[in-house]
Amino acid sequence: MAGKAHRLNAEEREQLLPNLRAVGWNEVEGRDAIFKEFHFKDFNRAFGFMTRVALQAEKLDHHPEWFNVYNKVHITLSTHECTGLSERDINLASFIEQVAASLS
């Protein structure tokens, strides 16, 4: 299990968030979290994506909030331990991007 998470400070956010914004991640209004909606060819690809992300999330002991309808997967990331964005969210979002790219 990873060490205690800390909430990203302003400098860390300036360094880490632009790359995620560039690929479609947005900040949740009124909450210290990021989200993105992914679209796939069909339900099987969406479910395969979720399965790969779930396996990694379990390894990291850091789980996304997500919602799936057919070929769409909406993901929100925030770290409950520090009540906001942490490096764990950035790392998981980066992994999620790699998985999504491999399925397109």
From Swiss-Prot:
Cross-referenced CDD domains: PCD_DCoH_subfamily_b (cd00914)
EC number: 4.2.1.96
Tissues expressing this chain: The major tissues expressing cDcoH are hypothalamus, kidney and liver.
Modified residues (N-acetylalanine): A2
Protein family: Belongs to the pterin-4-alpha-carbinolamine dehydratase family.
Subunit organization: Homotetramer and homodimer.
Task of the protein: Involved in tetrahydrobiopterin biosynthesis. Seems to both prevent the formation of 7-pterins and accelerate the formation of quinonoid-BH2. Coactivator for HNF1A-dependent transcription. Regulates the dimerization of homeodomain protein HNF1A and enhances its transcriptional activity. Also acts as a coactivator for HNF1B-dependent transcription.
Top-rank taxon: Eukaryota
GO BP terms: tetrahydrobiopterin biosynthetic process
Keyword list, A-Z: Acetylation, Activator, Cytoplasm, Lyase, Nucleus, Tetrahydrobiopterin biosynthesis, Transcription, Transcription regulation
Sites where the protein binds substrate: D61, H62, H63, S78, T79, H80, E81
Catalysed reaction equations from the record: (4aS,6R)-4a-hydroxy-L-erythro-5,6,7,8-tetrahydrobiopterin = (6R)-L-erythro-6,7-dihydrobiopterin + H2O
Location of this chain's protein in the cell: Cytoplasm; Nucleus
Gene Ontology terms for molecular function: 4-alpha-hydroxytetrahydrobiopterin dehydratase activity
Originating species: Gallus gallus
Enzyme class: lyase
Any one GO cellular component localisation term in the record: cytoplasm
UniProt-recorded name of the protein: Pterin-4-alpha-carbinolamine dehydratase
